[in-house]
């Protein structure tokens, strides 16, 4: 069997953060949570909820099914404008 859904979500988030050049603090601000909450979810100490997955997909400009398909598909679905090195609008509360 392949990876579990929680692992797939954590890996997709990590891959998207890397591809977009986004920090945990920036992602936390966009989702309205603390950086510590993002860290706990990424370490597996807490789980990403389905509502979180939907918010993450919206934040990264993709369909939630592409996001849930795992890191490879999620990165393929990431819009060019959100990729690292591209100019993207700042996220509410993000410090640049």
Where do the language-model regions lie?
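Residues in the helix-turn-helix
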Residues: 37, 47, 66
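Short, charged recognition helix plus adjacent turn
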Residues: 68-96
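Short, solvent-exposed alpha-helical "recognition" segments
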Residues: 45-50, 77-78
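The alpha-helix within a helix-turn-helix
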Residues: 17, 28, 57
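Generic structural marker for isolated residues within well-ordered, non-membrane alpha-helices
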Residues: 13, 24, 53
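A short, Lys/Arg-rich alpha-helix, primarily the initiator
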Residues: 1-21
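DNA major-groove recognition helix of helix-turn-helix/homeodomain DNA-binding modules
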Residues: 51-66
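Short alpha-helical DNA-recognition segment
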Residues: 21-43
């Amino acid at each position: 069997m392949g990876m579990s859904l929680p692992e797939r979500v954590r890996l997709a988030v990590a891959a998207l953060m890397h591809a977009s050049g986004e920090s945990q603090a920036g992602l936390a601000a966009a989702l309205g949570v603390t950086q510590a909450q993002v860290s706990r979810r990424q370490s597996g100490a807490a789980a990403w909820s389905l509502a979180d997955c939907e918010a993450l997909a919206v934040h990264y400009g993709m369909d939630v099914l592409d996001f849930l398909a795992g890191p490879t598909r999620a990165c393929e679905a990431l819009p060019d404008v959100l990729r690292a090195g591209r100019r993207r609008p700042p996220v509410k509360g993000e410090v640049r």
